[in-house]
């Protein structure tokens, strides 16, 4: 049985650290964490300021030249309860297959290492439905490369690090909010398909609250598919 967290409790309040806080889901996650009474402090590490540099008493916004230099941020990882990985890119945005792998897998692994070394008990990761680290893939076949690389990202955080709890969210198509949507996202949302990024963010926070309330829950915990993620908000 999973316990519902209904109101703020000093014992169950948590501190969070996030990478990918300027992305579609990461922005929503940050905003909701800052407005969540169970979260007492959020640290964001990225290449750009979040919220255009606007200040918030609950936000520690750490801007670095490159996420490949996460080792320079060691002090900020300490004394957190949950690490959120919202890193997400594509081959085109990254500049090529190797660059895509270096970002999705390389940065994710380095961040997981920083979190594990800081003894953060809970890691929460955005993956993708269908991700499979065992899949055959060539660099020039991006759909297969994407599925394999994302699968490797989730597999390494499970196998290579000693978190007390790992939560992996595997959504299908994601729908960004108005003003950021592609025509396909607009069409999908109008037909009732896809998962809004703010809903995914809410599910990740609800999961973090449950883990803080009951650390002995099963690990790793997979949330596979949009309907499963939506249903987790009702638990």
Kindly label every feature range from the protein language model.
Residues 3-38:
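N-terminal Rossmann NAD(P)H-binding glycine-rich loop of SDR-like oxidoreductase domains
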Residues 16-17, 41-44, 57-110, 114-117:
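NAD(P)H-binding glycine-rich loop region in Rossmannoid oxidoreductase-like domains
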Residues 153-178:
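Conserved beta-loop-beta element that borders a ligand/cofactor-binding pocket
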Residues 189-220:
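C-terminal helical subdomain
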Residues 19, 45, 86-87, 123-129, ...:
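SDR active-site strand-loop-helix element
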Residues 44-51, 173:
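Short, polar loop motifs at secondary-structure junctions
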Residues 95-97, 102, 109-149, 160, ...:
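Conserved Rossmann-fold NAD(P)-dependent oxidoreductase catalytic core, especially the SDR/UDP-sugar
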């Amino acid at each position: 049985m999973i316990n519902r967290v209904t109101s703020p409790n000093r014992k169950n309040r948590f501190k969070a650290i996030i990478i990918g806080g300027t992305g579609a889901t990461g922005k929503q996650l940050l905003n909701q964490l800052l407005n969540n009474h169970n979260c007492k402090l959020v640290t964001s590490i990225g290449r750009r300021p979040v919220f255009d540099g606007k200040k918030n008493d609950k936000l520690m916004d750490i801007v670095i030249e490159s996420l490949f230099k996460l080792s320079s941020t060691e002090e900020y990882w300490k004394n957190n309860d949950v690490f959120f990985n919202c890193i997400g890119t594509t081959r085109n945005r990254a500049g090529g297959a190797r660059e895509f792998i270096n970002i999705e897998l390389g940065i994710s692994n380095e961040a997981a290492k920083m979190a594990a070394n800081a003894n953060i008990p809970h890691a929460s990761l955005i993956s993708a439905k269908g991700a499979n680290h065992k899949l055959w893939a060539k660099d020039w076949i991006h759909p297969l490369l994407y599925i394999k690389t994302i699968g490797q990202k989730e597999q390494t955080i499970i196998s290579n690090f000693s978190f007390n709890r790992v939560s992996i969210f595997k959504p299908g198509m994601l729908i960004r909010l108005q003003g950021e949507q592609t025509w396909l996202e607009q069409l999908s949302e109008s037909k009732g398909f896809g998962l809004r990024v703010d809903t995914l963010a809410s599910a990740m926070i609800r999961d973090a609250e449950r883990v803080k309330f009951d650390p002995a829950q099963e690990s790793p915990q997979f949330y596979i598919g949009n309907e499963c993620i939506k249903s987790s908000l009702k638990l």
